[in-house]
Amino acid sequence: MESVDARRPIASNARTGAPYSPGIGPHTERATVQLVSEEMERQGSIQVEGFQLEVPYPDTPWNKCDLCIGVGPDWDWAVEIKMLRLMGDNGKPNDNILMHILSPYPEHRSALTGCTKLANAGFTGRTALLIYGYEYAEWPMEPAIKSFEILADQYVALGSRNHSEVKQLVHPIHKSGRVFSWEIFAK
């Protein structure tokens, strides 16, 4: 994320077309995944045969998995990715973002329902959930991540938590972040 951010990409408001401040922070989840995946491929940091975005689920092809790594149809990894951006580009709280992480309702396509979807999807390889987001002094990610882990444990078995920090981002609001991931197992 840091190397993509260093190029100062500019996202635009979906409704007005107005540009946001430079940086990876204001980009949509899909755009961020695309930008970071392309950067990892360019740098050679993906040490596998390949990857593909938006891969149909084996058992429900109308649903798409955010990222599959390896060679299809027997992917090494199927990964659902969710963004946790608690503040908007304007510095105001994003009031409904926790729904995208914690909602138990499939219609919300949350991180929580992504776990159960992955566990029952029919992928032959391993499955994982990745949550990336931005840290703010008054809105740290840890309480939301811990809440996710507690809720997810009701539906699936989570592997060990992996995480890394993202620092010195160029956006004036989305200045730093964290990336979390867990391997997902059916209960």
Predicted features along the sequence, with ranges:
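Interdomain/boundary linker segments immediately adjacent to catalytic/signaling cores
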Residues: 1-42
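Surface-exposed alpha-helical segments enriched in charged/polar residues
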Residues: 38, 116-120
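A short acidic/basic microdomain associated with nuclease active sites
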Residues: 40-68
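Amphipathic coiled-coil/heptad-repeat helices and related helical stalk/stem segments
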Residues: 61-63, 111-114
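Conserved catalytic cores of phosphodiester-cleaving nucleases, focusing on short active-site segments
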Residues: 67-69, 73-99, 118
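A short acidic, glycine-rich active-site loop
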Residues: 98-113
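Nucleic-acid nuclease catalytic cores
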Residues: 119-147
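Non-catalytic C-terminal interaction segments of nucleic acid-processing enzymes
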Residues: 136-187
